[in-house]
Amino acid sequence: MSAAAVERPNEDRPLIAEANRIMDRLPGYRVEIIGGQIIVSPPPDGPHAEALTDLMLPFAASGLHGTESKVLQGVGLWLPTGTEDYAIPDLVVVDADYRDHYVENNCYDPICFRLVLEVTSSNYRTDLRDKVKAYAAAKIPVYVIIDRKHQRLHVLTSPTGDDYESHRPHSPGEVVTLPKSIGAEVTLDVAEILKAGQPQNG
């Protein structure tokens, strides 16, 4: 049983109010609250966006963006790790009725998330450490990380406490099939994804 979502005024949410002020001052930046800390990420570069588009295609082709589930970018995920914690993953697979699970501040209850995916940027440590704990605590079944710095694709499954029981890094040359629990069979070519996301120099 879940209570109806109640929109709280920002005066009662000082961190959220500050995060929203930062977003107003820095259009295009991603602002999240993880572990009670405000995390500010610069706008993604072109290769980051290219990798994300290349990732969208196999998810959509598998039928995941349909009547049972949706494949979305930039959707807020309400986190249980703090009273104002939320994240904005790069890509998510959610139940089709995700709108019924709205919490507040453009964020949704983690119960409707089947998968979250992050393509790393300059603050890659957040994706590889802080968000592992946060997404595990939220019981997100599958967390995929495209680690552009170290040229790896990580698949984390079976959340327990603030960690995942299974954490498998994959290298270029491998082809990875994601767990069918997300609702369909999705296969990713590690080399192709990492090549598309290769950071620009300079």
Name the predicted role of every residue range:
Residues M1-A138, V142-G202:
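Gly/Pro/Ser/Thr-rich low-complexity, intrinsically disordered segments predominantly at protein N-termini
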